[in-house]
A protein has these predicted regions:
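Flexible glycine-rich active-site/ligand-binding loops centered on an Asp-His dyad
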Residues: 135-139
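N-terminal intrinsically disordered, cationic/polar leader segments
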Residues: 1-117, 121-131
Length: 139
């Protein structure tokens, strides 16, 4: 396991005017390569309102799987032009979350350094809403 620094920026577009909610997390993580993907493990913080949670990113060339464990738990899979539905568990109950990945841009080198960019829309009752962006920088 290698120690690494990870910067994760999440942006949610709030309205038609393009107003956005932006959260940045800079954290220490562990990084390993398991043959077909890089695995990044890190602890969430109060910045992400998920303190005490652990997150694992499994980063493949064509998709990313995000697994959150703790008081909030979910498994989200991002693959370009694919829809996905996952269970999202909170202390207040569980619900299904559906989303469509619009862009998946993998720019990691053979050491697992670089960036991954994802754009996805959360789908509520069959209607696409809430454009979200995730930028992951690993070095």
């Amino acid at each position: 396991l290698n120690k690494t620094k990870v910067k994760i920026t999440t942006i949610q577009i709030l309205d038609e005017a393009g107003n956005e909610d932006k959260i940045e997390l800079l954290t220490e993580a562990t990084k390993e390569f398991n043959g077909d993907c890089f695995i990044i493990d890190y602890d969430e913080s109060e910045i992400t309102q998920s303190e005490g949670n652990k997150t694992r990113l499994k980063i493949y060339k064509d998709k990313l799987i995000m697994i959150k464990m703790g008081t909030l738990s979910t498994k989200m899979e991002f693959e370009e032009n694919k829809n996905s539905t996952n269970m999202y568990t909170t202390p207040y109950g569980s619900f299904d979350i559906s989303f469509k990945t619009i862009i998946y841009d993998y720019s990691l080198n053979e050491l697992g350094n670089g960036s991954v960019y994802i754009e996805y829309k959360i789908i509520f009752d069959g209607a696409e809403e809430a454009l979200n962006k995730i930028m992951i920088d690993i070095n």
